UniProtKB/Swiss-Prot annotation:
Gene Ontology BP, a term: isopentenyl diphosphate biosynthetic process, methylerythritol 4-phosphate pathway
Pfam families documented for this protein: IspD
Signal peptide: none
Site (Positions MEP for the nucleophilic attack): residue numbering on this chain: 160, 213
UniProt EC number: 2.7.7.60
Gene from which this protein is expressed: ispD
Key word Magnesium present: no
This protein's record includes keyword Nucleotidyltransferase: yes
Protein family (similarity comment): Belongs to the IspD/TarI cytidylyltransferase family. IspD subfamily.
Gene3D superfamilies assigned: Spore Coat Polysaccharide Biosynthesis Protein SpsA, Chain A (3.90.550.10)
Broadest EC class assigned to this enzyme: transferase
Record's protein name: 2-C-methyl-D-erythritol 4-phosphate cytidylyltransferase
Pathway field: Isoprenoid biosynthesis; isopentenyl diphosphate biosynthesis via DXP pathway; isopentenyl diphosphate from 1-deoxy-D-xylulose 5-phosphate: step 2/6
Source organism (scientific name): Nitrosomonas europaea (strain ATCC 19718 / CIP 103999 / KCTC 2705 / NBRC 14298)
Free-text function comment from the UniProt entry: Catalyzes the formation of 4-diphosphocytidyl-2-C-methyl-D-erythritol from CTP and 2-C-methyl-D-erythritol 4-phosphate (MEP).
Amino acid sequence: MAEFIALIPAAGSGSRMGEDIPKQYRPLASKPMIYHALRTLCSAERIGMVCVVLAPDDTEWARHDWSEFAGKIRVFGCGGATRAESVTNGLKALRAENHVQDQDWILVHDAARPGLSRALVERLLDQLAQDEIGGLLAVPLADTLKRADDTGRVMCTEPRERLWQAQTPQMFRTKLLLEALEKAPTGITDDASAVEALGFSPKLVTGDAYNFKVTYPQDLKLAELILQERTATQN
């Protein structure tokens, strides 16, 4: 029976946040940002392991207490220069230690999406566990899209019908995901794009607006409010 394994690539620098520490360690609701994704993924009973891929020279991870996840996480210091490289290296490390089989499902999640909920994880597992290809969380695009010219003026308005904004986790079987990433064209920004490049069509599973990616400093306040509301509801 196929297992479910989550993988968080956490080797980025987060330069757009303007911080002197990597974004995934930026304090958020009194914890490092990555903590919130770890907590959600580790709480999902069907996920057997959560793999964290750090930069080889990471010095921040050891400064924090991760003991509450000790029975479920596996940490590798094999992150690469890009997200795709980090995921690829993490998969190879899992294989080398016999933690994963070709038909196991890998859920790749961004460390900078602290708003992921347990309900979204369960929805993803429910809808993709029997799928032939796999897929990803995503939300239908709500905003109007404008295409700009080189001077910053509007060239045209793009139709938004059938357009979705990709989120994570993105869930594919080990063998397919590794092959896709190894053959992926330069510049891909997510795992689904690599799978698409092989000619497959991943399934879109409806996510929600809370599962946004923290990219700029102004995103932090919204993420903080979401986490505070969730904590209050749970209590």
